Amino acid sequence: MKRALLKLSGEALAGEKKTGFDEPTVTAVAHQVKEIVDSGVQAGIVIGGGNFWRGRTSETIDRTKADQIGMLATVMNCIYVSEIFRSIGMETEIYTPFQCAAFTELFSKDKALAALKAGKVVFFAGGIGHPYFSTDMGTVLRAVEIEADMILSARAVDGVYDADPKLHKDAKKYDTIPIKEVVEQQLGVMDLAAAVLCMENKMPMTIFGLNEENSIINTVKGKSNGTVITV
């Protein structure tokens, strides 16, 4: 694998606290990413905002404003995680699809690719910059734009199941599943627009549990205990 787009769940980064950050978890992620970058893999990262804000659960705030708050939550997450990465000697860049000059660079495919090729970890914050599109869509879009080999989606749940494992103890986890089946069975892995973009661009994805030891490294090596979504 030459280039990967790592999607980190904001909720997973919060650990058992459910909100904010669990610094040992974030530091462990940083060390794993450093190891794969040192091995020659270029790493882009998208982080969800669920540890700060889940706008779709709000009944009082306008959807556009709720989504904008969510975009800013991802910017905060990327700034924090980027600094943890820097603290262990990694070089980073943060890109957003909107002006945020004091904190980030305006996204440019050429600049992002140059940073990746220079060995920097590149964070993509702010989704696609528009409401009504989830972080899933931002993840797939950036993966396609940077020509990633695969999306690595690190979550609180360790794969794709045929039912919610929190509600159904007999839920079955898939080792592999075609993206077409994910869409047809409405498994809730990602939103429909993101799934279609994956399918159209033949972008594979592995979904795995962030809390498993060395899960990111193992997934890059093809030894994940999660679910591989094929295209």
Predicted regions and their residues:
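C-terminal catalytic "cap/lid" subdomain
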Residues: M1-V231
